[in-house]
Amino acid sequence: MKREQLIQNIEKLKHVMPPYVLEYYQSKLTIPYSLNTLYEYLKEYERFFSWLVDSGVADVDKITDVSLSVLENLTKRDLESFILYLRERPRLNTHSTRYGVSQTTINRTLSALSSLYKYLTEEVENEDGEPYFYRNVMKKVQTKKKSETLASRAENIKGKLFLGDETQGFLDYIDSEYEKTLSNRARSSFFKNKERDLAIIALILASGIRLSEAVNVDLRDLNLNTMIVEVTRKGGKRDAVPFAPFAKTYFERYLEVRSQRYKTTAKDTAFFVTLYRDIASRIDPSSVEKLVAKYSQAFKVRVTPHKLRHTLATRLYAQTNSQVLVSNQLGHASTQVTDLYTHIINEEQKNALDSL
């Protein structure tokens, strides 16, 4: 979704929210939470407050009028009823005959509500310097995480990684072979963004940064001499992330055409841009997801930008055997999340030994 459309959608949701949700939104902007995160949270709040009104838990006609006292006095049983509603309601925007939303969606909803309750009960200050209320019912609600062993996750993911020579092979395919699969018209469109697309994919494969971090890179953030890219991590923390040397050529090729092809000016600070009606703007995450899917499907298997991040992490661990180093590269606070990469590499090593 383009930034302009995202802002419009956020404004529509803000228009129907209670005042304290707007305060929450404004507070999180200062951290800063990304607009994408806040948009997803606002959608969850709209769903929750709509249920409060429709179920009669809140005795009001519209969600704007749901008072703080409703949230303060909400019982654990009320929240459990809401969770059951999510599990049992007909699924929307799908042809599936299944009912209810996924556990992942429910966890996301509860995470958004926990963030709001934490703000209202701990972070915000009224005129007396106290929170709006103290009772946090969200602390009584447990979430169920998706159960899957590391072996299962590794098995599911390793076929979607471009390990070893496949990393460069993927880039070479886009650079030299992909155009041969296209019609004349499609080839012309491909050439318009070829250098930019290669630079985006190379950046993620060479650094392992998140999609949201990649699209928000500015020109000043990328240093080709030190081979460092500065990004804003989750929680608003700035980080200097090294990238592998193979990406440098793709950045240089893109920079050679960026100004003329995308008609950028000094005001266009975004590194990765797109051109619409002769106006340059920052590329949006959905556009990157689509281009990664398009090229990867033609090359080997359809993947997401996050799988490119997994690719870098797995390759880096294979070279270093250091979970700490991989965690730092990915911007993780602990090494627990890197256990997956060790499992993938251990399986690869076992397969290599079996073939001796």
Curated annotation (Swiss-Prot):
Keywords associated with the record: Cell cycle, Cell division, Chromosome partition, Cytoplasm, DNA integration, DNA recombination, DNA-binding
Activity regulation (UniProt): FtsK is required for recombination.
Ranges of residues in domain Tyr recombinase: 169-354
Pfam families attached to this UniProt entry: Phage_int_SAM_1 (PF02899), Phage_integrase (PF00589)
Record-annotated membrane-spanning stretches: none
Domain of life: Bacteria
Subcellular location: Cytoplasm
An example Gene Ontology molecular-function term: DNA binding
Active site feature: R210, K234, H306, R309, H332, Y341 (o-(3'-phospho-dna)-tyrosine intermediate)
InterPro entries named among the record's database cross-references: CB, DNA_brk_join_enz, Integrase-like_cat_sf, Integrase_catalytic, Integrase_recombinase_N, Integrase_SAM-like_N, Recomb_XerS, Tyrosine_recombinase_XerCD
A GO term from the CC aspect: cytoplasm
Ranges for domain Core-binding (CB): 16-121
GO biological process: cell division; chromosome segregation; DNA recombination
Principal place of residence: cytoplasm
The UniProt record lists the keyword Secreted: no
Task of the protein: Site-specific tyrosine recombinase, which acts by catalyzing the cutting and rejoining of the recombining DNA molecules. Essential to convert dimers of the bacterial chromosome into monomers to permit their segregation at cell division. Binds an atypical recombination dif site (difSL). Binds preferentially to the left arm and cooperatively to the right arm of difSL.
Other facts: In contrast to the XerC-XerD complex present in non-streptococcaceae bacteria, XerS acts as a single recombinase required to recombine difSL recombination site.
Similarity comment: family membership: Belongs to the 'phage' integrase family. XerS subfamily.
Protein name stated in the entry: Tyrosine recombinase XerS
Organism for this UniProt entry: Lactococcus lactis subsp. cremoris (strain MG1363)
